[in-house]
Amino acid sequence: ADSKAKITDWGTNTGAITGYYVGKEWGEIWGFKTADAYFTADEAANGVVLADGSRVGINEVYQKALYKSSFRYGEGDVKYEDLNGDGKVDSGKGTIDDHGDLIRIGNTTPRYEYSLRAGLQWKGLDFDFLFQGVGKREMWSQSSRILPLTQGRSTNIFTNQFDYYTPEN
């Protein structure tokens, strides 16, 4: 069965994409569209990349609205698209009317759920089985295996996370 739900009526409709609003599809995930990666430190520090691939601005880091504390984008980091063409990548006011460059990138609601149950009896011997699953589900995982060093000081770094971008690879 395919399972989708959309909000058609909500009393206090603020329009915030992080809350409930009329037209919201249950389970939607909002995020930024990736464009590529920064391959040099100079590229991370210079120029704004628009959705059409053109660059504007000199010595301007176009993703600065995404910085947290002292983090700065560098070689190997993800580059996001400026979808609304304002020269920066941000989430606007975080509302359905002004969501900046955020778009719907997925949905956490399980879809195409299925199950099969069968049984067999023969000479006092019973055999039953149940097979069930989900045909489609998207997730936004925030575990330390996905985003290391974001879950506190005691977070472990796994061996595969040491294989990061370098200009040589």
Specify the residue positions occupied by each region the protein language model found.
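Outer-membrane beta-barrel architecture
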Residues: 117-119
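Phosphate-sensing "switch" segment of ASCE/P-loop ATPases
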Residues: 123, 149
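Short acidic alpha-helical/loop segments enriched in Asp/Glu that coordinate divalent cations
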Residues: 42, 131-147
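Conserved small-residue
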Residues: 1-106, 148, 158-168
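Repeated loop/turn-to-beta-strand initiation elements of outer-membrane beta-barrel proteins
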Residues: 124-129
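Outer-membrane beta-barrel proteins
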Residues: 2-8, 136-142, 152-153
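Residues that define the transmembrane beta-barrel architecture of outer-membrane proteins
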Residues: 110-114
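Outer-membrane beta-barrel pore domains and translocons
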Residues: 1, 121, 132-134
